[in-house]
A protein has these predicted regions:
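A composition-biased, non-transmembrane "mature-region" signal
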Residues: 1-130
Length: 130
């Protein structure tokens, strides 16, 4: 699930998060609207109401602890040679994070963080808008 980073300041609503459509590349903002009598989750399709967006960062994070853990497990299992093998095999898997600023027709401005797959779906949804 995409991570809502904040930005919408409206006392009548509470943002729950940003979700990706199950069978398509669209995204919804999920929120409670306190002006309504029910506390049902409301959804707003971002692609249909987007005025503008801007990608502000794209980062690749890696975990150095993974390699150290692999080395320790290998060392404990078979000594120094296995420690080196464990460090080499465990590697440092990297993961991407993209932060995007959005502005909707209703005036809402917010930031959302997407992983690699969500970002691909985001780009696909934005390409369909054109």
């Amino acid at each position: 699930m995409a991570k809502y980073l904040g930005g919408i300041e409206d006392s009548n609503i509470e943002i729950i998060g940003v979700s990706q459509h199950f069978f398509s590349s669209g995204f919804d903002i999920q929120y409670y609207n306190y002006q309504l009598d029910t506390l049902a989750v409301q959804k707003l399709d971002i692609a249909k109401s987007l005025v503008k967006y801007e990608e502000v960062s794209a980062e690749i994070h890696s975990s150095p602890n993974r390699s150290a853990t692999g080395a320790l497990v290998g060392y404990l299992a078979g000594g120094p040679v296995w420690g080196i093998i464990g460090a080499a095999l465990s590697g440092n898997p990297a993961y991407e994070k993209h932060v995007i600023l959005c502005e909707l027709e209703n005036g809402w401005r917010f930031a959302v963080e997407l992983d690699k797959n969500e970002y691909r779906a985001w780009k696909e949804a934005m390409d369909k808008r054109r």
